[in-house]
Amino acid sequence: SNHPLGGQDGVALGYILGKHYNGNVRYLVNDLLMNLHGLAPLCIPINKTGSQSRDFPKMVEAGFASDNHIIMFPAGLCSRRQGGEIKDLEWKKTFVTKSIETHRDVVPLHFEGRNSDFFYNLANICKALGINFNIAMLYLADEMLKNRHKTFTLTIGKPIPWQTFDKTKTPAQWAQF
């Protein structure tokens, strides 16, 4: 899925897909979210904030080997304003390589939504100043509050068979396709 909001979209996807799949969903998430103890059992952490734990890669492999449906945001960060347009950053190839490795189909999801201008301006200022830490991430809780009582649209695409990701393109090219 795309990741326009950085919080509410993930919670909404988990709720909708969790109901449909009897709770058999897991999120591939920023390791910082492991500090939210109520959410942690549903999460497979990916290092974004510090040194990589030796257990994280094993947890990712176990998650993909399980019967759980994996919710992931291939850009790795929530959407940013680029050239005046709100869009995801470049998607990483992980969802393609894991689809091939584990023979899992990919179901594309599109979540319609946006954060405040403050959020996007802060993210762009930090990028322009060369600040590597994702300061904008610290404001995602505020963004959730700003978006309460709003309605969002989720579009669920047709499953893409894992066999689609053949050798005519690299996994990185498939991710951008």
Q: What do these predicted ranges mean?
A:
Residues R54-F177:
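Non-catalytic C-terminal accessory region of glycerolipid acyltransferases
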Residues S1-S51:
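Catalytic core of membrane glycerolipid acyltransferases/transacylases, capturing the structured
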